[in-house]
Amino acid sequence: MTCPKCGWVHYENPAPTVQAWIDRDGSFLALRRNEQPLKGQWNMPGGFVEAGESGPEAIAREVREETGLAIEVVEVIGIFASTYGDGDDALPIFDVAYRCRISDGDGSGALEISAESSEARWFPLAEFPRPAFAGERQALALLREFSG
């Protein structure tokens, strides 16, 4: 979009986001959304990257805020062009999915979910519910494909 008065060009670039697939002995953590968009659906800990953050820094912050867990990134699962929300108000995003593990002491980590979520559960890949967002569904498909 170009400003008709000054000629400045505004580019509709996607916002960078991150999602964490926290692996605990083959089960992965999902959070039930407690706010819109897609309230009541399952999704992964994650969110928007803040200015000056790297992807691993952003996912560590988001996981700590949403679950109280300290994590470390194991690998990148994939990078997906997607949207946050539905319909005309959907925001284009560039979503990086990380496979992570708990780094708190013995790895058990005590969950302390934020008000953003109403529930947290660990699911094996075979029983994992349909994630709320397209990028999460793509990451789940890749995890299932490469898990054996």
Where are each of the predicted segments found?
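Conserved Nudix-box catalytic region and its N-terminal flanking loop in Nudix hydrolases
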Residues: D23-E65
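A short coil-to-beta-strand element that immediately follows conserved catalytic motifs
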Residues: A70-I79
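A generic structural micro-feature
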Residues: E12-P14, Q41, D88-F94, E112-S117
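A structural signal for short, well-ordered beta-strand segments
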Residues: A20, V76, Y98-C100
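Conserved hydrophobic "DFG−1" position in protein kinase catalytic cores
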Residues: I22-D23, A30, C100-I102, W122
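Nudix hydrolase/Nudix homology domain
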Residues: G107-G148
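Active-site-adjacent beta-strand/loop module that shapes the phosphate/pyrophosphate-binding cleft
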Residues: F80-G109
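Acidic, metal-coordinating catalytic segment for phosphate/diphosphate chemistry
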Residues: M1-Q19
